Amino acid sequence: HKLKSKKAYGSGYHRLEDEVTGIDDYSGMRGGRFQVYLEEGVRKGISWQLQDGCDYHGTTPNNKTVNDEDENGNTLGSVTTKTRNYDHFVKVVPFWQLSLWTEECEKAPGAWGNLIHSYRTNFNASTFNTAGKQQIEMMKRFMDGCGIDLCDFFEKAGLLRPIHAYIEDYSPGWNVITQAMCDELKTYAASKGYPKAPAALNYINAYNCENFRNEVHLAEGTVGNGCTLQSNKVK
C-alpha cells in the first residue's frame, strides 16, 4: 500500500505506529510495540525471537525436555530448557521498516520481489536445513536483492545475533545461530562492496519515512538540552 492511500487503510492508521499498547515503562503508549522493539532489540541487544512484548508479557517460562541441536541440526542429547511464547507482532517491526525504506522511500524498489524470486528459482532445503541457517540465508538474499549492506540494521534488530533457544512459535523448535555464522554474513556483505544502509534505519516509521526518503540531515544539538526526565521517561 501507499501511506497516503485512503482505500484499504482508511485515513492512514498504522497499527504498529498508532496502536496504544506497550509494556513496563512503555505501557499504554501510542506505538507501544515500536517502543518495545527499540528497547528490547536496539538498546538491550536481545535476539529477535526473544524480544518481550504486549502479547504473552509476564508469561512464566515452562521447563521442557527436548533433544538439543547444534547449528547444523545435529542432535546433541536430551536437555531441559526454558521456553515460552513472545509477541509475534514485535517481530514484524524490522520487516515493516525494510518495506518503508525500500518501497515507500524508493531506495530499492522490488527488493521483496527479488527475495521471493530467488527462493523460487534457487533454494535447496537440504542445505538450509535449520531455522538458523534459513534466517541467515534470508538476510543474505535480501541484501543481494536490494544491493545494500544491511548487517548493522539486522544486528540492531536482533536478527543477526547469536542465539541458541527453543522457540515456541506457531510450531516449536530450535533456532541456533553462532557468532561465526554472523561474522560470515558480515564478511560476505563487505566482499560485495554494497553501500551501507543509514545508521538510523532502525528508527524509520510511517511518520518519519519522508526524512529518510529525502535524506534529511538532523541538526546537531547540545548534550543535555532538548529532553527532560519525567517519571523515569525521557520526553
Predicted ranges, named:
Residues H1-K6:
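Active-site recognition of the HExxH zinc-binding catalytic motif
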Residues T130-K235:
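Beta/coil-rich, acidic/histidine-enriched accessory regions frequently appended to metallopeptidases
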Residues G22-Y166, N175:
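Active-site-proximal alpha-helical
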